[in-house]
A protein has these predicted regions:
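Conserved SAM/SAH cofactor-binding pocket of Class I
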Residues: 26-96, 102-105, 111-113
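S-adenosyl-L-methionine
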Residues: 1-32
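Conserved Class I SAM-dependent methyltransferase catalytic core
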Residues: 7-9, 13, 130-185, 189-190
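Residue-level signal for inorganic ion chemistry
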Residues: 24, 106, 134, 192
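Short amphipathic alpha-helical segments
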Residues: 75-76, 115-117, 161-164
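SAM/dcSAM-binding transferase cores
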Residues: 184-238
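Mobile active-site "lid"/loop adjacent to the S-adenosyl-L-methionine
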Residues: 107-133
Length: 238
């Protein structure tokens, strides 16, 4: 497939999407390819949801984002995709009129209290939205056999499994992300399915770098960047 360049406007001096979102999108592709309806939670500038929309033009793709500036960027970036709709809303207050085949989410928080972004307007942490609350709401928005595809810090694996189990979402596929072969995993990529009894499949880890040189990416990572084919444009918003 010839994937067109996805141009993404982002607010200047605000939290920007990073490689986590691109790794998550690549991981999600087998689970969303036949989806009729997809939801991107906490869409930010729209990178995840719009990649889904670009590569699945027959799917209905909804994006929900509570920050007004980021929601504006999602709306701006989504103009070329008639199969998308952006909602400015806190996900916990979001009441969609449909159920989704797949829900994707790169939560902008970490369970253990560390903060992804130093920008106060976009830094969130466990006290604002814990993973258990997120999953409970996801459950209500999924079709009976729908998928929840997400990334999270690897240290919180036990919390993730417990939260999913409490809502009868089964973690079916798991992949860890490591900076180097000899380093511990820092990120997990997970696909959980509603009302599933399947055994867990753990995929080989995604190794991101050959060396400490940030541009010395592995072949798989370079391939992911090529598949996603995104370009960021920083914009000043009042």
């Amino acid at each position: 497939m010839d994937r067109k360049l996805l141009r993404l406007y982002q607010p200047l001096n605000a939290y920007s999407y990073n490689s986590d979102s691109l790794f998550l999108y690549d991981f999600s592709r087998p689970f969303i390819k036949n989806s009729g309806a997809i939801l991107d939670i906490g869409s930010g500038c729209g990178v995840l949801g719009l990649l889904c929309a670009r590569d699945n033009p027959l799917a209905i793709v909804h994006l929900v984002e509570k920050d007004s500036k980021m929601a504006f960027c999602s709306q701006k970036n989504a103009l070329k995709f008639p199969n998308t709709q952006v909602f400015e809303s806190d996900f916990l207050d979001f009441n969609p009129q449909i159920l989704y085949d797949a829900i994707v989410c790169n939560p902008p928080f970490y369970a253990l209290g560390s903060i992804k972004s130093k920008n106060k307007g976009h830094a969130r942490h466990q006290s604002e939205l814990d993973f258990a609350s997120l999953v409970a709401k996801v459950k209500k928005c999924l079709k009976p056999k729908g998928y929840f595809i997400f990334c999270y810090e690897a240290l919180s694996l036990c919390l993730v499994i417990e939260s999913l189990k409490s809502t009868k979402l089964t973690l079916e596929t798991l992949r860890f992300v490591q900076s180097f072969k000899d380093k511990n995993a820092h990120l997990m990529l997970g696909a959980a399915r509603n009302n599933s009894k399947s055994a867990l499949k753990v995929l080989p880890p995604l190794i991101t770098h050959h060396s400490k040189n940030q541009s010395d990416n592995t072949k798989e990572v370079l391939n992911i960047y090529q598949i996603c084919n995104t370009y960021s444009i920083k914009a000043f918003l009042n």
